[in-house]
């Protein structure tokens, strides 16, 4: 199943004239629990932090030390697992033959984050629509959590005062 999704994504990578595509764990709001969890969709990785770079010939999953073993078990067959911050993508991409064009969803990254991760190691290309969304037909339900008001004696200000600011 993972292999099929990766292959479909690689077809889109070719269609968009890219050398690769970045898939983060976060959503557009940088929420810890995101829906859809595109990283899990493409890799089956269920940890709460990480990102993947799918290249034409190699797939990388970047995780912090908490998830090294877990990621090997869940998706090590299809991804080279890289522990961050020991190794950043820019170090790996600089070792490749040419300067790659890597696509990304601009709603899921900040320019500061991209610069930190990739530096000048590749050419980054913002793609209008998320490529994982294009291949994934069974959209999961949106993660929705209820919200509630806390009393002003806890927060120091009432909801109406805060909204009116």
For the regions a language model picked out, list residue spans one by one.
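Ligand-binding face of N-terminal immunoglobulin V-set domains in extracellular IgSF glycoproteins
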Residues: 102
